[in-house]
């Protein structure tokens, strides 16, 4: 008899709630990511996805709930979360523009080096050994993402897609067990998106669990073992890609449904009911409108005499006031 062991959870978020004054951005969200798993997090703009990421990584202190990594509840401090084994990227690129590609990756190694300030100043044998090991590890990561040949280039000179890759390499430099990617393909063309998809699979093959936010549905459904959908800060549904993309609630969250009393909502309900019954709804009657009353034409005034009136000098004077010398002045002011 063979026994199968359940996958061990790397991340356990329980009842995570985040309030900003009277606004609840995340409400009672539970999410688990297992070892060697890729989990997708989707939802419309403003659903609370990045806020949830910030709660996981210690940038925000959750109002309620807890976050545990490999069974240990994490303190809400970013450097301690990184040291524990969770790394992340951000929606917007946050590279050090005036540092080289290699130096950017070395920045991500600081949580894995034991050398302190005085060691760096004195540059003793221990420091030099640790520095050489960090450079070797950084170069290995650049080789992994295909940027080893650009190690000495300034990061600002890299194409957009390569800057995104460099951010991932910097996050991996901290040797995480869980990698959080916030919209890693934003702004990419289809070729770059496909390359990123292959990179994430390669990261998973290294034993690193991945939790990824993305709006590219084809990318996220091809990539993920499970997908969770957030709507207005709450987890709406969670399951496999096939289950989530076919869920009517998810479709409604993205495309919208007419609310009660909305223009056209009643007509749409009638059409849907008729389609369900297999009949065609009768067209709505157009209310008759009363013809507007035509005012009677006023009879033209008949002059008292048949002789046509002649214009006097007063009739030909321009409109306006007259000064003491008889010259005309405009209502707007005297003409120059």
Question: Can you say where each PLM-predicted feature lies in the sequence?
Answer:
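ABC-family P-loop ATPase nucleotide-binding domain
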Residues: 1-17, 259-336
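Glycine-rich phosphate-binding loops of nucleotide-dependent enzymes
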Residues: 2-277, 333-336
